[in-house]
From Swiss-Prot:
Motif, COPI vesicle coat-binding: chain positions: 194-201
Consequence the record notes for mutating L15E: Embryonic lethal
Gene name of the encoded protein: Tmed2
Signal peptide as annotated in the record: 1-20
Protein topology in the membrane: Single-pass type I membrane protein
Domain GOLD: 30-112
Keywords of this entry: Coiled coil, Cytoplasmic vesicle, Endoplasmic reticulum, ER-Golgi transport, Golgi apparatus, Membrane, Protein transport, Signal, Transmembrane, Transmembrane helix, Transport
Short motif (COPII vesicle coat-binding): ranges: 194-195
Its biological purpose: Involved in vesicular protein trafficking. Mainly functions in the early secretory pathway but also in post-Golgi membranes. Thought to act as cargo receptor at the lumenal side for incorporation of secretory cargo molecules into transport vesicles and to be involved in vesicle coat formation at the cytoplasmic side.
Residue ranges of the region described as Required for TMED10 and TMED2 cis-Golgi network localization: 118-157
PANTHER family: TRANSMEMBRANE EMP24 DOMAIN-CONTAINING PROTEIN (PTHR22811)
Name the record gives this protein: Transmembrane emp24 domain-containing protein 2
GO biological process: allantois development; branching involved in labyrinthine layer morphogenesis; chorion development; embryonic morphogenesis; embryonic placenta development; endoplasmic reticulum membrane organization; endoplasmic reticulum organization; Golgi organization
């Protein structure tokens, strides 16, 4: 029989397999992150550019044999999942080399699934239903946590866009008001000079 403490420890271990990070990538720079897994392990990368330039970044996932698994150019967000094709260290890289001067802030999460079970466990006919339910609950909780983090980032991005647009509209309105006042004063001056009576002495 599985105790409550063992169940909580299993749930905590399952939730700990997903790591969320914010990283700042300077112009002309590349940042890489590494995960060592066994063959057959399910892995996933979820990312979103939170700040900087046109909110785009180059993404590349490479296997231990230097085989390209995924490559995306100028992406602002994305989700990609795959199963490890061999044992070893997998490389997740974000490149800002296309940017001339703007650093980018990228929020990303690397999800590492459970390692594949051994033959002796696969041959068992009966699996513990409680462990299965806890595993499903942990996956669902991780997905909700990721979705909440991405919603916060999107809300921050849209608020920054709204503030920027609002300040531009206010500045443009102020400029238009100044032009209107200048034109009004110019017309008054012109009409006043037009109706002036010039005396010849």
């Amino acid at each position: 029989m599985v105790t409550l403490a063992e169940l909580l420890a299993l749930l905590a271990a399952l939730l700990a397999t997903a790591s969320g990070y914010f990283v700042s990538i300077d112009a002309h720079a590349e940042e890489c992150f590494f995960e060592r897994v066994t063959s057959g392990t399910k892995m996933g990368l979820i990312f979103e550019v939170a700040e900087g330039g046109f909110l785009d970044i180059d993404v590349e996932i490479t296997g231990p044999d230097n085989k390209g698994i995924y490559k995306g150019d100028r992406e602002s967000s994305g989700k990609y999942t795959f199963a490890a094709h061999m044992d070893g260290t997998y490389k997740f890289c974000f490149s800002n080399r296309m940017s001339t001067m703007t650093p980018k802030i990228v929020m990303f999460t690397i999800d590492i699934g459970e390692a594949p079970k051994g033959q002796d466990m696969e041959t068992e006919a009966h699996q513990n239903k409680l462990e299965e339910m806890i595993n499903e609950l942990a996956v669902a909780m991780t997905a909700v946590k990721h979705e909440q983090e991405y919603m916060e980032v999107r809300e921050r991005i849209h608020r920054a866009i709204n503030d920027n647009t609002n300040s531009r509209v206010v500045l443009w309105s102020f400029f238009e008001a100044l032009v209107l006042v200048a034109m009004t004063l110019g017309q008054i001056y012109y009409l006043k000079r037009f109706f002036e009576v010039r005396r010849v002495v």
